[in-house]
Amino acid sequence: SRSGLANPRQPASFLFLGLSGSGKTELAKKVAGFLFNDEDMMIRVDCSELSEKYAVSKLLGTTAGYVGYDEGGFLTNQLQYKPYSVLLFDEVEKAHPDVLTVMLQMLDDGRITSGQGKTIDCSNCIVIMTSNLGAEFINSQQGSKIQESTKNLVMGAVRQHFRPEFLNRISSIVIFNKLSRKAIH
């Protein structure tokens, strides 16, 4: 950004990695509560429901000539009414590659185009994606704090799953520690 080459329309984006129940989704809720004084200012997209090829039309809406054209998509409708929000893509590794292509457009340009051809601004969102990729490495290590070797194994699993251009658009990747007994109580 010091060089002046950063895209000011690019939304802040984070990939939270860790075990199930380690607080990834809860942190996203707290971010929405902190920034917007309302945890409901979060748009949650469950990517396990977006594993089919037609899932893009669920997010963006169908194109002209298809059933439901006038209804719009879930994501585009939500972003029209809540342009300032935390956008949570839960379990992003389960999304169809076409959905990831739409997300790539959002992370790159700060906008997406609905099925009706309307441009939706995403530049004021904070995009948070959660994933359990590499969880087996975190689970098998000793202690609750993530070790450097474990971090490398987790990042290797992430690099195998996602395309480099997708990972390069993410502002920060955060690996969550295992929950300790002290943290639970």
Where are these regions (language model features)?
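AAA+ P-loop NTPase nucleotide-binding core of proteostasis motors
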Residues: 1-185
